[in-house]
Amino acid sequence: MLSKLQIEQYENDGYVVPDFKMPEDTIKKIEERHDELLKKHPEFKNYCPAILHYDESFLEFCKNKIILNYVEQILGSDFALWNSSFFAKPPINGHATPWHQDGQYWPIRPLATCTVWLAIDDAKVENGCSRFIKGSHTEKKLKSHNTNGNKTLTLNQEP
């Protein structure tokens, strides 16, 4: 469960890092399934935008009860998973994710959504760990994004 302080942090800052670690055996299963996916779809080496479309077995990991409880504490009990993506972050990958608002990519209104990010690779500044602009969610509106055709980006839009 998220603490009251963690929920307040999410409400104020727009993100929270829970005290949770996926069990090692589950991480190993995710890595094995990802390896199998890449054998069939090598084009997803850096990014797979809709992994459940290509391998429904990943849904098992999206149903983790602890993670679902965290989401329920943030959004309430009426929520749905509508997408699951895979961003590879091995060392010296060369693919960057530009600053963006997740809601710009999601056709969901109102913007009552959240992202659950589970790091499988070590998340460090050197390989592109997630960074957030504290409080940027409080405006509750999307900034316009422009298309960027740079092939070294995992996402093609940025403000």
Residue ranges and their predicted role:
Residues 1-108, 144-145:
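Non-heme Fe(II)-dependent double-stranded beta-helix
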Residues 15-17, 115-119, 132:
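Conserved hydrophobic/aromatic beta-strand scaffold that supports enzyme active sites
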Residues 35, 40, 121, 152-155:
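Juxtamembrane helix-loop transition sites at the ends of transmembrane segments
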Residues 77, 91-93, 111, 122-125, ...:
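Short, charged/polar surface micro-motifs in flexible loops or helix N-caps
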Residues 100, 107-125:
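Short, conserved beta-strand element in jelly-roll/cupin
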Residues 125-159:
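Double-stranded beta-helix
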